[in-house]
């Protein structure tokens, strides 16, 4: 589900621009033992997200973060955490970047990759069983909570993504527009036809990080 934090060039990129970077190993992250992983079972959008919120509050209390200057950025499950963050705690973040993130829990199950079918029963334990847990999963599905979004949002995805299909981003874009959000004012959109679950081509990475530097700089003020 999530991997233990380690050296990450994105962290260094952001830190080199003067930002304090907080990357937390919320429950479900590997590297801290089986119990830490199992604590995440059935907790998407619940206690897993509370771990993120609590970490931000801790950073504020420690004087590391300015409560008026916090952005949230994540990829894959981290992208889901971004969406959960700006729908569950919409006042907490000045801006947000959802990078190849899950937005629709129903779509996550209906579009599950063939190679993951052997893990289907484990997925039901870790995330939930959509046939039996539909009410819970719909309640923590960001696509159903778009009306709560107040935070400027950058959506980044690859058309060839087989882990989190492009439909997650496309549905989110449509729902934002249905709720009166305007591209270029309320949300931004970067999709690459030659990328999958993350950008790997140098030109695309350069474009992405140039855009992110400008985006964060627009909303995070010197304090």
Feature-to-residue mapping (PLM):
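Short, small-residue-biased leader/transition segments that mark boundaries at the very start
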Residues: 1-3
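Active-site-proximal cap/loop segments of hydrolase catalytic domains
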Residues: 5-17, 23-223
């Amino acid at each position: 589900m999530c991997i233990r934090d380690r050296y990450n060039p994105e962290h260094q990129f952001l830190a080199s621009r003067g930002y304090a970077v907080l990357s937390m190993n919320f429950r479900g992250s590997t590297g801290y033992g089986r119990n830490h992983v199992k604590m995440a079972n059935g907790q998407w959008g619940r206690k897993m997200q509370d771990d993120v919120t609590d970490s931000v509050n801790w950073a504020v209390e420690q004087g590391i973060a300015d409560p008026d200057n916090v952005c949230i950025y994540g990829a894959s499950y981290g992208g889901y955490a971004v969406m959960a963050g700006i729908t569950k705690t919409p006042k907490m973040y000045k801006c947000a970047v959802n990078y190849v993130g899950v937005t629709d829990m129903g779509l996550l199950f209906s579009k599950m990759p063939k190679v993951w079918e052997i893990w289907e029963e484990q997925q039901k334990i870790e995330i939930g069983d959509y046939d039996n847990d539909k009410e819970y999963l719909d309640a923590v599905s960001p696509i159903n909570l778009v009306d709560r979004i107040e935070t400027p949002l950058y959506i980044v995805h690859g058309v060839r993504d087989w882990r989190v299909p492009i439909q997650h981003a496309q549905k989110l874009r449509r729902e934002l527009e249905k709720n009166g959000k305007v591209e270029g004012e309320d949300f931004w959109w970067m999709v690459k036809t030659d990328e999958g679950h993350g950008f790997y081509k140098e030109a695309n990475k350069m474009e992405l990080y140039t855009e992110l530097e400008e985006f964060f700089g627009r909303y995070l003020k010197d304090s």
